[in-house]
């Protein structure tokens, strides 16, 4: 999979992304994170209605290599969790930005998006190895 970072998304240091969706903000993990994890076998996500806080763990992703926590790029209330990814974790691996999104949230403070990196900055970060 080519490591792509869509320009309409914003990225956290911890490799999660946030971007516009028809239900608020779509949250997932970047192609870089997916590439580092390898074969994904399990995804745990919060329930609809849960509150998540920026920088706090909101779930885990398990691969054949490791179990990693995922951290909220922005604070808000979960309005959708991608059941398809829970049922078929390979969707996350094959298409992290479209079919493999994780959550849709109503943001508590939309200005938190401005604190995240744009695609150019994020690409430079991961290609620089930091």
UniProtKB/Swiss-Prot annotation:
Cofactor(s) needed by this chain: (R)-lipoate
CDD domains from the UniProt entry: GCS_H
Pfam families in the cross-refs: GCV_H (PF01597)
GO CC list: cytosol; glycine cleavage complex
InterPro entries: 2-oxoA_DH_lipoyl-BS, Biotin_lipoyl, GCV_H, GCV_H/Fam206, GCV_H_sub, Single_hybrid_motif
Keywords, sorted A to Z: Lipoyl
GO biological process, alphabetically ordered: glycine decarboxylation via glycine cleavage system
Tagged with keyword Ribonucleoprotein: no
Cofactor note: Binds 1 lipoyl cofactor covalently.
Sequence positions bearing N6-lipoyllysine: 65
Span of domain Lipoyl-binding: 24-106
HAMAP family: GcvH
Family to which the UniProt record says this protein belongs: Belongs to the GcvH family.
Subunit structure: The glycine cleavage system is composed of four proteins: P, T, L and H.
Role, per record: The glycine cleavage system catalyzes the degradation of glycine. The H protein shuttles the methylamine group of glycine from the P protein to the T protein.
Protein name: Glycine cleavage system H protein
Source organism of this protein record: Synechococcus sp. (strain RCC307)
């Amino acid at each position: 999979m080519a490591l792509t970072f869509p320009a309409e998304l914003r990225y956290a240091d911890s490799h999660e992304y946030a971007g516009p969706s028809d239900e608020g903000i779509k949250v997932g993990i970047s192609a870089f994170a997916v590439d580092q994890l390898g074969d994904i076998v399990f995804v745990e996500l919060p329930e609809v209605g849960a509150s998540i806080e920026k920088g706090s763990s909101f779930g885990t992703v398990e691969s054949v290599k490791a179990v990693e926590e995922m951290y909220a790029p922005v604070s808000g209330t979960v309005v959708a969790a991608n059941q398809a990814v829970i049922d078929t974790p390979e969707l996350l691996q094959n298409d992290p930005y479209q079919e493999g999104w994780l959550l849709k949230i109503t943001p508590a403070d939309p200005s938190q998006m401005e604190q995240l990196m744009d695609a150019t900055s994020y690409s430079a970060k991961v290609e620089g190895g930091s």
